[in-house]
Amino acid sequence: MAGPVRGAAGPWALDLLRALPRVSLANLRPNPGSRKPERRRRGQRRGRKCGRGHKGERQRGTRPRLGFEGGQTPFYLRIPKYGFNEGHSFRRQYQPLSLNRLQYLIDLGRVDPTQPIDLTQLVNGRGVTIQPSKRDYGVQLVEEGADTFKAKVNIEVQLASELAIAAIEKNGGVVTTAFYDPRSLEILCKPIPFFLRGQPIPKRMLPPEALVPYYTDARNRGYLADPARFPEARLELAKKYGYILPDITKDELFKMLSSRKDPRQIFFGLAPGWVVNMADKKILKPTDEKLLEYYSS
């Protein structure tokens, strides 16, 4: 029993406690105005069988593996294999170089059209990015911008489309397609680090057997083709696309336009076996007969 309650509300409070029922689970109610979402009963959607159906392996969780078709030969074994991506990591890649991009580099002065153009000029002019470690084997000259190309150039690329060759020869230029092995390609793209090592310039390797027909064909302007067949191939292409073939022998830049590399040569003006001394700015040439025979073979 509680002690005496002080104040006027004392007797009234005691009477109220005596009259009110005791607090229990039977008389608990939520506060007036409060809301609580009603719990969904099991029988509304997934009750009884819990969505697993009536007996069987599907209800008991012993389903077969993915792709099993009840014992018959599955689909992934009925269809034969085909090597769509076979040898994809060994395929040669060529970065595209459009005529529009080449004209843009010439207009900005990043590529000099009065000098023979090869990968060294294109890489130094930030026209293309070549990564021999990622199976890059050079550039492919494509015909985008053939209608607006106006420069007269002597360019060496690895692949070239027929229309791109026609667009350059229409302006009096010369195109040569040449192969570079990965080591020669890396030296050609980054000559300064190679010269600083003080090593002799190696010989350029010949193309693999699969590429020999391409580089020995005068229609592709291959560097291994017979030079006597080039005039006929140039005239045939001019007739096909309907333009007058300029006579480059009367051009003031004929010496530049007619310059070509030897099949074993990497740089213009530098023969295999030579050593470029960057410190003294000199070129060292071999004099031993065996070395001369090796690098000239």
Swiss-Prot record:
Residue ranges of the region described as Disordered: 27-68
Keyword Membrane: no
Single GO molecular function: structural constituent of ribosome
UniProt key word Ribonucleoprotein: yes
Alphabetized Gene3D superfamilies for the sequence: 3.100.10.10
Compartments reported by the entry: Mitochondrion
Keywords of this entry: Mitochondrion, Ribonucleoprotein, Ribosomal protein, Transit peptide
Span of the transit peptide along the chain: 1-22
One annotated GO biological process: cellular response to leukemia inhibitory factor
One GO term describing the cellular component: mitochondrial large ribosomal subunit
Residue ranges, compositional bias (Basic residues): 37-53
Record SUPFAM superfamilies: Ribosomal proteins L15p and L18e
Family: Belongs to the universal ribosomal protein uL15 family.
PANTHER family, A to Z: 50S RIBOSOMAL PROTEIN L15, LARGE RIBOSOMAL SUBUNIT PROTEIN UL15M
Protein name: Large ribosomal subunit protein uL15m
Natural source organism: Bos taurus (Bovine)
